[in-house]
Amino acid sequence: MNATLAESLWSGLAVSRVQQVLAVLVGTLALAISAHIQVPFWPVPMTMQTFVVLMIGAAFGARLGAATLVTYLIEGTIGLPVFASAAGLAGPTAGYLVGFLVAATLVGWLADRGHGRSVLTTLIAFVIGEVIMLGMGAGWLATKVGLAQALSLGVVPFLPAEGVKIALACALLPTLWRFARR
């Protein structure tokens, strides 16, 4: 049985470096697009990035998911317009960006071990990923505005939307797995 959704979709094929590079590029494109689908909050905009980050981890696994997020962070660092705000790793959202890498890698590690194939395991993996992203984001933001403000500006407003994104993933991932097994 294939460990990740990407491997399952490519089953019967030797997964080449070209396919892996293509997956990374598609993943970074999805992240860049999702960064610009936003509801403008300050200092942290609400985007679809967290959903895409977790889906990348769940679909690609730890290694390819981490490679995708490292590539994305490099793209933003060298000036490509892929981040939600121009400040990127120098601004108030830096903790979230680093949290994206950690969350995608951990969710990918869980996916490598079979999480994400059922509603329950998807829920567990994605809640862990969300805690990492919001925790690291708020931790960095707290160095700028204090812990109480970081929680009220960088966590609490996002909880309802993150819940909806997790529910969407809980419906989508097991369905994709059923499709991939055919």
Q: Where are the language model's segments positioned?
A:
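Membrane-embedded alpha-helical hairpins and interfacial helices in multi-pass inner-membrane proteins
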Residues: 115-182
